[in-house]
UniProtKB/Swiss-Prot annotation:
Gene name, Swiss-Prot/TrEMBL: atpB
Signal peptide extent: none
Annotated source species: Proteus mirabilis (strain HI4320)
Residue ranges crossing the lipid bilayer per the database entry: 43-63, 103-123, 149-169, 223-243, 245-265
Top-level taxon: Bacteria
Compartment list: Cell inner membrane
Membrane topology qualifier: Multi-pass membrane protein
The family this protein is said to belong to: Belongs to the ATPase A chain family.
Protein name as catalogued: ATP synthase subunit a
Function per UniProt: Key component of the proton channel; it plays a direct role in the translocation of protons across the membrane.
Amino acid sequence: MSASGEALTTRDYIGGHLNNLQLDLRTFELVNPHAENTPSFWVLNIDSLFFSVLMGLLFLWIFRKVAVKATSGVPGKFQTAVEMVIGFVDSSVRDMYHGKSKVIAPLALTVFVWVLLMNALDLLPIDFIPYIGEHILGLPALRIVPTADVSITLSMAIGVFILILFYSIKMKGVKGFTKELTLQPFNHPVFIPINLILEGVSLLSKPVSLGLRLFGNMYAGELIFILIAGLLPWWSQWLLSLPWAIFHILIITLQAFIFMVLTIVYLSMASEEH
């Protein structure tokens, strides 16, 4: 949501909110987004990394606090809410994962709550944290929604992809996994190159689609908040930003759920023995 009051052009305002706080790994200096810089691969979006780690620590703190204070009697409201989330994730895993791993349910819970917390940062006033970063901390730029950064979402998706490969090889063996890539869908040695291309593309599309789906939805949601704040007068922004924020609560929850579901489904497919 917006708290905008800066005397900026619309173009500068919108562009300023789309810049990450970047560290140039070649010089270990902060990148000035307002200067003419040559695009480089060797930069690190340290704001996205910071807020993603912060939300991860918040997740651990919340669940540890509930675990320490959990009672067998009548639970409090906070404990009840956490238990509802755990029960919801556990039932989802039981319905979708048909293997025997004890890691999948904790992984699904971590993915769901972590992504949900990162998505929820999009509900903070769009100018509040960047204003603190620029005027109090003296930072050249600051974005607070990690899931609106494609490097974060693709990094998480790559982590899931590594688990897919691990469970595929664990359950089927190296030989079975190789056969799956080379002898499907056409079970003849002549078609091995075609099978390898088809199965390779199918396998690689999983992390790409997983990461880009989350990024695209969250980036679009963040951009709408920025456009509302940048194009409308301050006294009329609430007419659109408040309804969109209410609707966005559904979006951030749904995207966290979809990321969790696809993670479970992909790992379930990888764990199937053929």
